[in-house]
Amino acid sequence: MTSFESFERGWKAGQNQIVYARLTADLDTPVSLMLKLAEARTDTFMLESVTGGEIRGRYSVVGMKPDLIWQCHGQDSRINREARFDRQAFQPLEGHPLETLRALIAESRIEMPADLPPIAAGLFGYLGYDMIRLVEHLPGINPDPLGLPDAVLMRPSVVAVLDGVKGEVTVVAPAWVSSGLSARAAYAQAAERVMDALRDLDRAPPAQRDFGEVAQVGEMRSNFTHEGYKAAVEKAKDYIRAGDIFQVVPSQRWAQDFRLPPFALYRSLRKTNPSPFMFFFNFGGFQVVGASPEILVRLRDREVTVRPIAGTRKRGATPEEDRALEADLLSDKKELAEHLMLLDLGRNDVGRVAKIGTVRPTEKFIIERYSHVMHIVSNVVGEIAEGEDALSALLAGLPAGTVSGAPKVRAMEIIDELEPEKRGVYGGGVGYFAANGEMDFCIALRTAVLKDETLYIQSGGGVVYDSDPEAEYQETVNKARALRRAAEDAGLFARRAGNG
């Protein structure tokens, strides 16, 4: 446990502090951590990672008991600084929402110990696709049947970090000087939160029950008809032929009944579609569940990173077939041209916040393999410029070209025209602003929203001048299959009570 003496020194200097303790946890998994600590609570989250469809990331994180929650609705933001005790105690904030968020990020800074990863404290949640309207002048938004906040970020007062390499869990409790508490009182409260979590970790996970293999989900209902989506693709091609854009990414949203516990969907998804960015957020009135393959923007050690993905083939049944499919993908002129467009867009996005002369691709047109598919991937980095920060870096890449198009602003205007509803979470970013000033967000792809016993899945595809409308429609259907399959199998992971 962090000593009071070291805590007090920083506290008296006006610096936010953390209290943390470690526990051997070589028998625990990310799921058991969630089940023990937070699975029956609202305003909780879980983050984990699998690279290449098979290699688990070192750290998995569970967060809970936020001391504050920030939300954005259109041109207004609000905050609940009593979130642990009253979930409804939101107060409006004066000023532009992005400036209130920037101030909150600054308020939440902590100089973290070197033996803790950046993800151990900070602000966690999502910035939806429509947050770009606070930056770019875009036409009026479409109808919003889900009615969710455009962005939600929570600041957990307890974070548990599972280190899969060392087989231990670290429980972290931040303490904020803005609380006005004495050093002794602040330390005592943080230490109590740590000890409560450690006691929960000592107990066995709740008993589970198999609901059977029968799918307990309804039929998918789209906000497009089949012909309506193909007509949208044709309209997009008209804009391309007219020279307005090079590419645009229309999408469709499906809804289906889903009466199983939300965390069961996440557990099913992590099994059927392990991905580099896996997340479960329970915001009380709704949940966001995803397995995204793609970075939106990352800021680490003052280096900004984007990693465009475009170009896909299924995995082969044998190593020989896999190599043949890779060769086919890398010789497909349409796929290569689309990827090059997005690589150039990534350079431009990084260049908006990077020092002149530092933007460069570190990987170009490489193949990255996942459990079911392979993609063409490039990596672009740049050193962040003086005067820029984690929020400006994120906004420079929001939304990614892979969910909007190129040129980006005109493509978004066309998306507003083609799509019948506001996008919401889809196409935005999910991740965190770390307490040490770093940031990591993925694109909200392969992401589901659960609200009022309804599951919403959205997917799109890049339309270029020679796109086939039927093929584009089928691409969106195929991209939704991972979540559809996870929903069908979720009954295998449902528990008797308290799940989600």
UniProtKB/Swiss-Prot annotation:
Enzyme Commission identifier(s): 4.1.3.27
UniProt: chorismate binding residues: 311-312, 426, 446, 460-462
Recorded metabolic or biological pathway in which this protein acts: Amino-acid biosynthesis; L-tryptophan biosynthesis; L-tryptophan from chorismate: step 1/5
Mechanisms controlling activity: Feedback inhibited by tryptophan.
Keywords, in A-Z order: Amino-acid biosynthesis, Aromatic amino acid biosynthesis, Lyase, Magnesium, Metal-binding, Tryptophan biosynthesis
Top-rank taxon: Bacteria
InterPro entries tied to this protein: ADC_synthase, Anth_synth_I-like, Anth_synth_I_N, Anth_synth_I_PabB, Chorismate_C
Cofactor: how bound: Binds 1 Mg(2+) ion per subunit.
Protein purpose: Part of a heterotetrameric complex that catalyzes the two-step biosynthesis of anthranilate, an intermediate in the biosynthesis of L-tryptophan. In the first step, the glutamine-binding beta subunit (TrpG) of anthranilate synthase (AS) provides the glutamine amidotransferase activity which generates ammonia as a substrate that, along with chorismate, is used in the second step, catalyzed by the large alpha subunit of AS (TrpE) to produce anthranilate. In the absence of TrpG, TrpE can synthesize anthranilate directly from chorismate and high concentrations of ammonia.
Assembly and oligomerization: Heterotetramer consisting of two non-identical subunits: a beta subunit (TrpG) and a large alpha subunit (TrpE).
Name this polypeptide is given: Anthranilate synthase component 1
Gene behind the chain: trpE
